[in-house]
Amino acid sequence: MASASQKGWMVPPGLAFLSFSAEAWRAHAEASMPRFYFDVAEYKRYFEIGQPPWTPGVSVHYALDKALSMMLDEGLDEVFSRHVRAAERVRAGVADLGLSLLPDLSCASNTITAVNLPEGINGADMLRIMREEHDVVLAGGQQSLSGKIFRIGHLGLVSDEDIDGVFSALKLTLAKLRG
């Protein structure tokens, strides 16, 4: 398993979380390919003596400690339920604007929503206006979806007011782009 501090942990980028099965460790030990940049065995050796192999991002560790405390105080069931409610609110906002989702609802995420760009709307212009005029940062599509979709993240501590603000800005932005 792999994760990163900015992926729902309510922490800035800077930490990676990795977990390996016994089988994965055996495969690593038997692998012969060179390890030029990152070797998990190095981290494992240092972990066993209670130290990191290099200077860690200490402030990010403190942020993680605080975020984990907040999640435990809220309760994990409530954290997961909050993400479901946020996803439902975002999907309702998408529908209210007459937009369509990229994925089928059966496989839609509770942490990010991919939305098809409306016909005739330039995605780069939309993202720029959202950012520059409304202080709202959305993500575009990647690779084959570049210029075809945009993504609304609702991962971590996202309130109803945050979501409503995104859709207020999006409504204004789409109206401006449609002329």
Give the residues covered by each predicted segment:
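Active-site C-terminal subdomain of aminotransferase-like
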Residues: Q6-A92, D96
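PLP-dependent enzyme catalytic core of the Aspartate aminotransferase-like
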Residues: S144, K148-G179
